[in-house]
Amino acid sequence: MLLLLLVPLFLRPLGAGGAQTPNATSEGCQIIHPPWEGGIRYRGLTRDQVKAINFLPVDYEIEYVCRGEREVVGPKVRKCLANGSWTDMDTPSRCVRICSKSYLTLENGKVFLTGGDLPALDGARVEFRCDPDFHLVGSSRSVCSQGQWSTPKPHCQVNRTPHSERRAVYIGALFPMSGGWPGGQACQPAVEMALEDVNSRRDILPDYELKLIHHDSKCDPGQATKYLYELLYNDPIKIILMPGCSSVSTLVAEAARMWNLIVLSYGSSSPALSNRQRFPTFFRTHPSATLHNPTRVKLFEKWGWKKIATIQQTTEVFTSTLDDLEERVKEAGIEITFRQSFFSDPAVPVKNLKRQDARIIVGLFYETEARKVFCEVYKERLFGKKYVWFLIGWYADNWFKTYDPSINCTVEEMTEAVEGHITTEIVMLNPANTRSISNMTSQEFVEKLTKRLKRHPEETGGFQEAPLAYDAIWALALALNKTSGGGGRSGVRLEDFNYNNQTITDQIYRAMNSSSFEGVSGHVVFDASGSRMAWTLIEQLQGGSYKKIGYYDSTKDDLSWSKTDKWIGGSPPADQTLVIKTFRFLSQKLFISVSVLSSLGIVLAVVCLSFNIYNSHVRYIQNSQPNLNNLTAVGCSLALAAVFPLGLDGYHIGRSQFPFVCQARLWLLGLGFSLGYGSMFTKIWWVHTVFTKKEEKKEWRKTLEPWKLYATVGLLVGMDVLTLAIWQIVDPLHRTIETFAKEEPKEDIDVSILPQLEHCSSKKMNTWLGIFYGYKGLLLLLGIFLAYETKSVSTEKINDHRAVGMAIYNVAVLCLITAPVTMILSSQQDAAFAFASLAIVFSSYITLVVLFVPKMRRLITRGEWQSETQDTMKTGSSTNNNEEEKSRLLEKENRELEKIIAEKEERVSELRHQLQSRQQLRSRRHPPTPPDPSGGLPRGPSEPPDRLSCDGSRVHLLYK
């Protein structure tokens, strides 16, 4: 809008050099140039808009601004007047350099400014004066010239007692110069530096001098116990104890309360030392190892990891650290899925991590054990784009390249295994180049300490922890200064301290607890458990070297991220294998093929049913109980129809439709079996019941009433309907999921396939199947038995019972085989469906073909299409087809018997001829004797009968 107001103004070029005094014009005020090293802030206009105009409207205001450490001298704001001029044009505006404003204040003193006004400009003079009991250290005057004060800023220092009159306060320290952690090699010189700096200050403990009494603990609790006894029971009295490593600090801190001593450690990281009930007077400038845990949890949340695994060396420091981590991740909604530990050999735990598919792994162990772990990691291939390892950051930078005879991995293999891992390390040296309370920067401290050491820092134990030891002395000095009333405040006499004086101990404790200052290691402050709060450095091993990727301040929950993290796979991996659930569906080719067969079977059943109904007046059909055959055809149709829902799964239907499909399977198959097999079973049952009676009960054969057959079928169907109804109401079928073992995909992707299969099931499925299979199996076995028993029965009432028996054989065999096989193959959807559906199809086909095709063939080939009335009118005889068949069979049997009789007669004639020939031959050899008057000579008792004699009764035996 303002630009629209300026459009009518003429665009006119400025004069040479940009005149400061614009010409009067009714159009507004001409744009003026800013002062040197300065600029003009145009309110409401952009830079492009300012370039497009030369005049500004009346009442428009501009503001001068200066660059760098400069201030505007003269009018800072000018306003366009109605006469076309700017306000206060007679006074120029300049940007001049100012001197540091810190010289305008003095702690414990006053500053007097002359020759200028605030802020301090060129020519300004300041004079410094200290308060009573303080004296000025430095020049009392300074002049501002071209932005610089002529002298360094002085400070006010408390008037101290002369050095010879200062009272000594003793510190008992234990430095581990050797052993598991030789941190005393660098920490002792750092403590000595701090004592020199503190004792040289007049504003801290002006009446006292801190002195050190120390021993080498060798990081051994036993050795430390000896020196602790010497410190406590030998003069002079020590006002505080300073142990180093965690094992020694645990011993000292637990015993110190008995002597009312404060314990201040510079190198202990064990989380167990944070227990205030066990260690009530313990403080440490070395942060607890649990300080890594908030950083780890923050990184887990940053990368969206919800499941992690851990592996630790079995020591107290790592066990307590892991316990703390477990509590923190639980609060953050993260789960530790697998936890492993080892004492010396990590081979088995690493294998377990691999077997459990651990992806995000936190490792807590010392440097030597770290090499063993990652040698096993390489062997198990537990590294790469799928895995992230979190390690402790205080290892040496080349720890994985160090020769170690206890492992059998090369440097190249170790380098490959550790690539990409994350480390968290406590910030022990202030990364900012700011001055600490000792007036030294962190870099100046490192340079000064390096000159003091007798060997290279990388070869000196505890060099990283040296800033913590230096700041520990400063924390102690400030606490004692506050307790003693240093700086003009009232306090207690430190020289009155003894091991029974709890009052002084309590005051020192409160002073230590409220410590807050800037040290060379950063901001020093203690939490409620006496542990140092500090920043955490986050690094990642990239290309064989560690790169800083961020810092984390747990006190403020502030994560400073440099976005320099690199991942082997291009992005952070998942915390677990991504499981893709896939359903196993029935083969559509198999389903379509069986469906076609089932459809053709239904068509065949309809044809057979139609044929049977159409020819129900034919006597031959009537004698086969056509209504039962009709029920068989209907039952086969229902069973064949069950094939369709049997093959439907999630590929075709939704989850909500699945229960209906399950019920359709059950009812169609159940009713189909009851009608189809039940009608055949009824036939064979009544044939066996009626036509296998003894002779005295032949009257039963004449009284086979059809309603009894229908009642039997109805009973079987009713039992199924009742059972199915109870099943559906009490325990209905529903969709259940069967889950299989995970499968690896063919592609190289970080996913796992979880196959699943849908089933129709209920809570007590086995019970219901037991009931069904129990009585259905009995029916099948009984049907086989009855079919076998009636195979030789011939009856006019049910003329197709032999075909029924054959159908029962086939149905029973298929059912008895298929039922257990499908239960075994239930997890293989194609095989189970193929067995079940093909058994239904084949049994239905066989039943229909065996029962109906012979009838069709007989009626077609013999032309027996007449009804019983028509047949009687045509022949005039009541002989039925069954009697004709019997007559034909009897005639055939008669012919066969006549043939046998002829053969026998021919044989008899032959034997008679042979007998006569022998009699004639014998009469020639023995002439005839006179006849006995009695009619013949008597034979002796032993004389055999004559072979030529022939008894008529014997001849008749030949015809039998």
UniProtKB/Swiss-Prot annotation:
Residues 612-630, 688-709, 789-803, 854-960 are cytoplasmic. It is a multi-pass membrane protein. Residues 866-879 have a biased composition (Polar residues). Ubiquitously expressed in tissues including the forebrain, cerebellum, eye, atrium, ventricle, lung, stomach, small intestine, colon, liver, spleen, kidney, urinary bladder and skeletal muscle. Expressed at low levels in testis, and more highly in brain regions. One of its GO terms (biological process) is positive regulation of glutamate secretion. The chain crosses the membrane at residues 591-611, 631-651, 667-687, 710-730, 768-788, 804-824, 833-853. Residues 20-590, 652-666, 731-767, 825-832 are extracellular. Glycans are attached at residues 23, 83, 408, 439, 481, 501, 513. Residues 887-915 are annotated as: Interaction with ATF4. The modification Phosphothreonine is found at residues 872, 929. Residues 1-19 form the signal peptide. It comes from the Eukaryota. PROSITE patterns: G_PROTEIN_RECEP_F3_4, SUSHI. It is found in: Cell membrane; Postsynaptic cell membrane; Cell projection, Dendrite; Perikaryon. One of its GO terms (molecular function) is extracellular matrix protein binding. Changing residue 247 to A: No change in the affinity for GABA. Keywords: Cell membrane, Cell projection, Coiled coil, Disulfide bond, G-protein coupled receptor, Glycoprotein, Membrane, Phosphoprotein, Postsynaptic cell membrane, Receptor, Repeat, Signal, Synapse, Transducer, Transmembrane, Transmembrane helix. Residues 29-95, 97-158 form the Sushi domain. One of its GO terms (cellular component) is Schaffer collateral - CA1 synapse. Disulfide bonds join 99-144, 130-156, 219-245, 375-409. Residues 870-924 form a coiled coil. Heterodimer of GABBR1 and GABBR2. Homodimers may form, but are inactive. Interacts (via C-terminus) with ATF4 (via leucine zipper domain). Interacts with JAKMIP1. Component of a heterodimeric G-protein coupled receptor for GABA, formed by GABBR1 and GABBR2. Within the heterodimeric GABA receptor, only GABBR1 seems to bind agonists, while GABBR2 mediates coupling to G proteins. Ligand binding causes a conformation change that triggers signaling via guanine nucleotide-binding proteins (G proteins) and modulates the activity of down-stream effectors, such as adenylate cyclase. Belongs to the G-protein coupled receptor 3 family. GABA-B receptor subfamily. Alpha-helical parts of the C-terminal intracellular region mediate heterodimeric interaction with GABBR2. The linker region between the transmembrane domain 3 (TM3) and the transmembrane domain 4 (TM4) probably plays a role in the specificity for G-protein coupling. This is Gamma-aminobutyric acid type B receptor subunit 1. It comes from Rattus norvegicus.
